[in-house]
Amino acid sequence: LEHREATGIETIISLQTDLLDNRCPIRTSTKLVNTLAARALTEEGQWEPADSVLNAKAILVQLSSSISYLEIVHPTDLMNTLVQDYSETSITWEHTVLDLQLEKGVIRRARLQSWWLHNDSGLELTKELIDRFSQSTPPLTT
């Protein structure tokens, strides 16, 4: 993914079952070390310390004095986000996606974006990236 002030990647998770009726939640886990600070975006649109938010829409981690990492799960795919470990120098969190009953042959997809951005870009850039991703349609791939 490209943006004039950030570099990113998009991960697409696909799930299909051969069982008649199956529940198989998918979880992603991210751990970052040597971090300076971490914030989470609340459902009300406020950035709070990451360990105080129960169900984050996005996680923003300051990696250095100049670079931050932003992780977003598409809002139609996110079931839950849990910060599992948060200290002064590291953070670990888990997203639960696709926690649905699936019927045989049905394919479901979830999308996650990871962005590295300059700290001088401010929260306006994070809002732009989150809004753009939230309004995007999934690619029509198999």
How should these model regions be labeled?
Residues 61-142:
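Beta-strand-rich recognition/accessory modules
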Residues 2-51:
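Acidic (Asp/Glu-rich), glycine- and aromatic
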Residues 38-74:
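Extended boundary segments
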